[in-house]
């Protein structure tokens, strides 16, 4: 089994460089990821908690938590199946602040799978007047990133997974991409 990653995503095992920034990890021990067998239970639990759409989007895009929670409906282009990532939410001085993403390279357009777009359109029907893709059920505004993380942590515990931080879901995407591509560079 050979899965291709950027070097910063590999935590151990035999590593072979195959390009300037791509490496093949064989028999590696990755950073914490959500195992493939736990993805369905994770998504089922997310659905029970009312957050299937953001968690599904996370698994198909690997967005940072702040990027995910700052998304607005205007960022989604249904026809072209793209999502514009151009802002992030974070807590500063006790208040939620929406600003530009972590780095200039973080401003990007992401192509979405058709099933992800369909799920997002269904999510929009649940709260059509709200500008946020995933509004907080408490406030109707953007989710507090810490509260969203705590809900993710609760779901991880419910499904019996070893601790997988929300940020680790980005690494899960790398592995899913490797499985979907038949363990080759796609």
Question: Model features per residue range: what roles?
Answer:
Residues 87-105:
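Short, flexible, glycine-rich and Lys/Arg-enriched loop motifs at helix boundaries
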Residues 75-82, 162, 181-186:
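Short, polar N-cap/turn motifs at the start of nucleic acid-interacting alpha helices
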Residues 80, 88-91, 113-162:
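Active-site/catalytic core of tyrosine-dependent DNA strand-transfer enzymes
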Residues 84, 109-111:
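Generic structural detector for well-ordered beta-strands
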Residues 1-13, 19, 64-66:
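N-terminal DNA-binding recognition helix of tyrosine site-specific recombinases/integrases
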Residues 1, 9-11, 28, 140-147, ...:
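N-terminal core-binding DNA-recognition domain of tyrosine site-specific recombinases/integrases
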Residues 56, 60-67, 147, 151-156, ...:
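C-terminal catalytic core of tyrosine-transesterase DNA break-rejoin enzymes
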Residues 22-73, 78-79, 90, 106-107, ...:
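Basic, Lys/Arg- and aromatic-enriched nucleic-acid-binding interface segment
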């Amino acid at each position: 089994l050979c899965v291709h990653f950027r070097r910063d995503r590999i935590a151990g095992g035999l590593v072979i460089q195959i390009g300037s920034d791509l490496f093949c990890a064989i028999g590696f021990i990755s950073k914490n990821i959500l195992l493939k067998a736990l993805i369905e239970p994770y998504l089922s639990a997310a659905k029970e908690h009312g957050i299937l759409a953001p968690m599904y989007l996370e698994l198909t895009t690997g967005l940072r938590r702040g990027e995910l929670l700052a998304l607005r409906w205007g960022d989604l282009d249904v026809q072209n199946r793209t999502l514009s990532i151009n802002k992030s939410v974070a807590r500063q001085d006790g208040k939620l602040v929406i600003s530009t993403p972590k780095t200039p390279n973080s401003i990007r357009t992401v192509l979405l799978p058709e099933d992800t777009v369909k799920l997002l359109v269904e999510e929009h029907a649940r709260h059509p007047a709200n500008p946020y893709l995933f509004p907080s059920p408490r406030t109707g505004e953007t989710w507090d990133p810490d509260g969203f993380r705590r809900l993710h942590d609760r779901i991880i515990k419910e499904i019996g997974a070893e601790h997988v931080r929300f940020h680790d879901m980005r690494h899960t995407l790398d592995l899913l991409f490797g499985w979907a591509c038949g363990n080759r560079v796609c």
